[in-house]
């Protein structure tokens, strides 16, 4: 078989073909019937597709490269609270996952949709669902914001444009926060209305949130430390009626992504106190 002549036109055709869609070098070799060294040389200056891109060509691997939208700000917050980054046994492939209660499964579906991820939601048999995507690029971007393997010991509030910080806080709140607004009977048979917003997490993260709320809303609450298993965590509580109202107004202002059950409790709180 005569040796194929590699013209400049053929080289450009091969480059264009490779860039037309995610594919392996082997696929290019087979199409043009050229050796691996030849194809590698022709494509040496072209960025290669990652394993994640090959397996899931439509996925937005660069979703967290820059925090510049409600969607990536909110899911960054949710990952800070309820996310996990881990490597496979080889240490070369990173995965990013979020685990939520089954009643919040729709948020896992939303995450899947915004990433265009071709993956399924898994279930642990204990009332939780999980979505996991493989991407070294995404893991590297998230590391810039403190979402790293074993992050539970090191989380903090990252520096991002202030216009997106409330979306991040809402994501953290939906993951590791709680809101209470309900009547509770007293010993005399009458009801009192309980209300509270709280965050739990590392002392650094709670201090960061406390400082942010002080700077932006003049809140004076400080986190308290408590022992949890083999480590210490902190809790930040907001119990003043006006502060809870102001907090809710800010985290839900213009929001389209949030856990419905927590937002409903905030609406119940507003209704009980006739707050507008």
Enumerate the predicted regions with their spans.
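Internal intein/HINT superfamily modules and their associated LAGLIDADG
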Residues: 1-276
